[in-house]
A protein has these predicted regions:
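Loop-to-helix entry and N-terminal half of a specific, functionally important transmembrane alpha helix
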Residues: 294-333
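N-terminal membrane topogenic signal
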Residues: 1-9
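Membrane-helix boundary/helix-loop-helix interface segments in multi-pass membrane proteins
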Residues: 3-4, 26-152, 323, 327-333, ...
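Hydrophobic, glycine- and aromatic-enriched re-entrant/interface helices and adjoining loop segments
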Residues: 182-277
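Short, highly charged, low-complexity non-transmembrane loops/tails of multi-pass membrane proteins
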Residues: 212, 367-405
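Alpha-helical transmembrane segments of multi-pass membrane proteins
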Residues: 11-25
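Hydrophobic alpha-helical transmembrane segments
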Residues: 44-52, 272-292
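Hydrophobic alpha-helical segments of polytopic membrane proteins
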Residues: 69-70, 74-78, 135-148, 155-201
């Protein structure tokens, strides 16, 4: 098991607990009468998440290569995505299932299930010359999930899922033309967010989604409306400066910054601990992502390689979208920051992703050892064959020498006689 990945995962999770408690204490005290409410819940998710990650790392071989199980899990996911439409909406979206203990968000689990499916089918059809066969299953599964999630509506999850699957597909060996067209499509998609307000308001989006687009363009146009959250995030970062105001001394979390303990947790880190700590946190987070990419390039097993690449891309895209929204570089879509933001479904999914990487690296090590053993066995067989050939040659030489000696003896007897 890769200790570096596991240690960084635990370190970020522990830091996340500290910041969730600090960012949520005021809100939880005023809403439920207990300042530790969100801390206790997140602590339970962290303990469960670490256990799940280690469990997957040690037992993944039992189910990751089972295609029937993959299909069953995917069907269950689709049923859950359909079931959410029977639930009451939260903040304008029907994305959660109320389980009494916590709210389950099936669309979050779609990310790791699609990574699993991609790694499985890209490895299965690695020798296929038909690109349709190679991409049919992963892209078809993604398309159905994206349609259902978009209907909730949850544009942020769809954006991350599509971008993640597109980038993972590029690693399978797209042609230069396909890469060029994909790049053009990405640029067009990003420029789409800069459409004039007069056009955006007529597109089939909910009112709050249109508001997020508008605040992304210029939050200062409506400081008390759609631009309010972005501006409060900016103020939190500005107030913290380089060194921060001190842990638990945030003003923005006291009712000014919405979702301070979830989507905008990094703003509170900046306000209380300063830009230097924000920078260190991001360095650790992106070191983890780059380390996963680095380990992926040495994987001999294609399944392990695609699993690592998929998780690395997922963490990179999700982190980028969250940070981009905070800095005003992307629309606010309610995307949490991996390992740091409050949220049961989000943290468990991130834990599953880490478990998948730990398993992939462990399995690849076994896979490489198996290859080495086969090479040694083949070399041993070749050596045995060579020894047999040598022994046969020696026997032939001995017989030849004996025949020569016998002939010489006979010759001596004849001449002597």
């Amino acid at each position: 098991m890769d200790k570096i990945i596991l240690m960084i995962f635990i370190l970020l999770s522990a830091f996340g607990l500290v910041m969730i408690y600090s960012a949520s204490s005021y809100f939880s005290l005023t809403s439920v009468g207990n300042s530790e409410y969100f801390l206790i819940r997140q602590f339970a998710f962290v303990v469960a998440g670490i256990a799940i990650a280690i469990g997957i790392a040690n037992n993944g071989k039992k189910f990751f290569f089972n295609e029937r199980l993959l299909q069953i899990v995917y069907v269950i996911l689709i049923l859950l995505l359909l079931f959410v439409f029977t639930q009451s909406g939260i903040k304008g979206a029907k994305s959660w299932i109320n389980l009494r203990i916590f709210n389950l968000q099936p669309s979050e689990f779609a990310k790791v299930i699609l990574i699993w499916a991609s790694a499985f089918y890209y490895q299965k059809f690695k020798d296929s010359k038909d690109w349709k066969q190679l991409y049919m299953y992963p892209m078809g599964m993604m398309a159905l999930v994206s349609i259902l999630v978009l209907m909730q509506p949850d544009f942020g999850t769809v954006m991350i899922t599509v971008l993640m699957m597109w980038l993972l597909a590029l690693t399978t060996g797209f042609s230069k033309r396909a890469i060029k067209y994909s790049g053009v499509a990405f640029v067009i998609g990003y420029l789409f967010t800069y459409l004039p307000i007069s056009i955006i308001q007529y597109l089939p989006f909910k009112a709050y989604q249109v508001g997020r687009f508008l605040s992304f363009h210029n939050p200062w146009d409506d400081t008390s409306g759609v631009g309010y959250q972005s501006i409060q995030g900016f103020l939190a970062l500005a107030r913290g400066g380089l060194t921060g105001t001190g842990l638990s001394s945030s003003i923005q979390k006291t009712g000014f910054l919405p979702e301070a303990h979830t989507d905008f947790i990094l703003a509170i880190v900046g306000e209380e601990l300063g830009f230097i700590i924000v920078w260190l946190v991001l360095v650790v987070l992106f070191f983890l992502i780059l380390y996963i990419f680095w380990k992926a390039q040495f994987c001999k097993s294609l399944f392990s390689r695609y699993l690592c690449l998929g998780v690395g891309i997922f963490l990179l895209v999700q982190s980028g979208v969250n940070i981009g929204a905070l800095l005003g570089l992307a629309p606010i879509t309610g995307v949490p920051l991996p390992f740091l933001s409050y949220g049961g479904s989000s943290f468990i999914v991130s834990s599953i992703a880490i478990g998948m990487v730990l398993f992939a690296l462990k399995y690849d090590k076994e896979y490489q050892e198996e290859i080495k053993n086969k090479i040694r066995m083949n070399e041993f067989i070749l050596e045995e064959d060579e020894e047999k050939e040598i022994s046969q040659e020696e026997q032939l030489e001995e017989v030849t020498v004996q025949l020569i000696d016998e002939e010489e003896d006979e010759h001596e007897e004849i001449t002597g006689g």
